[in-house]
From Swiss-Prot:
The lineage of its organism: Bacteria, Pseudomonadati, Thermodesulfobacteriota, Syntrophia, Syntrophales. It comes from the Bacteria. Its main location: membrane. HAMAP family: UPF0161_YidD. This is Putative membrane protein insertion efficiency factor. Keywords: Cell inner membrane, Cell membrane, Membrane. The keyword Repeat does not apply. NCBIfam families: membrane protein insertion efficiency factor YidD. Transmembrane segments: none annotated. Belongs to the UPF0161 family. Could be involved in insertion of integral membrane proteins into the membrane.
Length: 74
């Protein structure tokens, strides 16, 4: 199995989160795009390994003491 296959699985799991779990909470993401959308873009653009790493870094920045704002995938 290739990393491309696992990248697609990860994207499906993130989409399921967006559809099933995210609506249960108030919209409070301090970033644009949202962290889940950022993760999908990062995995599509950089592949599974680097994209996942970028998504994790973004999640660690998501806390009340970070100002948030526009943070595109680079």
């Amino acid at each position: 199995m290739t990393s491309e296959f696992f990248a697609k699985i990860l994207i499906i799991l993130i989409r399921l989160y967006q559809i099933l779990i995210s609506p249960l909470f108030a919209p409070c993401c301090r970033f644009y795009p949202s962290c889940s959308e950022y993760a999908i873009i990062a995995v599509r653009k950089h592949g599974l390994s680097k994209g996942s790493r970028l998504a994790l870094i973004r999640l660690f920045k998501c806390h009340p003491f970070h100002p948030g704002g526009y943070d595109p995938v680079r």
